[in-house]
């Protein structure tokens, strides 16, 4: 169990924090520990629900880099709820745009981001992407 723990902490870039009390970790570090804990169960699917929403903008990249690594190096399906549109476009095989609890549009990242068909999707992307 200890070897698995150390391997997972290394995977999320926190092996140097193995003796640290959780309260002394930053929000981004705590989120990466949470990801490592989930991976300990060897899941085939992970649900990631707004994993960066409560983080300082300066540490969002730490968490997104862990997800990038998992996406490239592990046979793992990830279902992610996010407002990080650039990141979603970069790593996704399929994207769904939800509004008021309903799927308004879905497709490949290229289809949805570069050529949205639904008017609400167009409005959302215009507002979000122009803000960034």
Ranges and model annotations:
Residues 106-107:
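ABC ATPase "signature
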């Amino acid at each position: 169990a200890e070897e698995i723990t150390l391997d997972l902490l290394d995977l999320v870039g926190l092996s140097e924090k193995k003796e640290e009390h959780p309260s002394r970790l930053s929000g981004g570090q705590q989120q990466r520990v949470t990801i490592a804990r989930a991976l300990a169960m060897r899941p085939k699917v992970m649900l990631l629900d707004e994993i960066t929403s409560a983080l300082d903008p300066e540490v969002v990249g730490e968490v997104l880099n862990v997800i990038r690594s998992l996406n490239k190096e592990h046979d793992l399906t990830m279902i992610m709820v996010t407002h990080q549109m650039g990141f979603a476009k970069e790593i996704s095989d399929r994207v769904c745009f939800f509004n008021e609890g309903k799927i308004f549009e879905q497709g490949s990242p290229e289809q949805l981001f570069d050529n949205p068909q639904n008017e609400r999707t167009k409005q959302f992307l215009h507002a979000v992407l122009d803000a960034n």
